[in-house]
Amino acid sequence: MVAIAAAVRAGRRDPVAIVAGVAQRHAAIHPAINALIQPRFEAAAAEAAVIAAGPLAGVPASVKECFGVCGLQTTLGIPGRAGLIDAEDAAIVQRLRAAGGVVIGKANLPQAMYLHETDNPVWGRTNHPRDPGRG
C-alpha cells in the first residue's frame, strides 16, 4: 500500500491503471473465490482519475459488506436486507476516501457477521484462495 501510494503521488504509477489491473485479476479469480461480491470498477476508475494526493493516494481497497458505501447494498448476508441501497458512505469509508483510497467494491462476510466462515444466503460462500474447496 505504501509503495503504491508513493508511486501515485510521485507520478510514477497511474491510479486508473492500478484499478484496471485489480479488475482484471478479479475477473480471473472471482468465479473460484467469490470474495468481492459488489465490485464497482468503473466508478473506482473515475474516482482514481482525480486522485493524486493523500497517504493512500490511488490505493485500491475493498470494504467489508457491513460498511455503507453510497450506491451499494449493505445486507449483512440477510435476504430481507437485499436490494436496500446505501445513500451515503459510512464514516470509515469517508475516511478511506479522504486519505486518497479508491473503493473498488464490497467484500463478502458471514451472515450477520456471526460465524467464522464466510457464507450467507445473499452472496454465497467465499472460498480460500489457495484451496477453493475450503471456505
Where do the model's predicted regions map?
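Aromatic/hydrophobic pocket-lining residues that form the small-molecule binding cavity
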Residues: 15, 44, 89
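An N-terminal boundary/leader segment
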Residues: 1-41
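Long amphipathic alpha-helix in the N-terminal Rossmann-like dinucleotide-binding domain
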Residues: 42-49, 100-101, 110
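Short secondary-structure boundary/hinge segments and terminal tails
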Residues: 26, 44, 112-115
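Short glycine/serine-rich loop/turn segments
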Residues: 57-135
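Short amphipathic alpha-helices and their capping/turn segments at secondary-structure boundaries
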Residues: 49-55
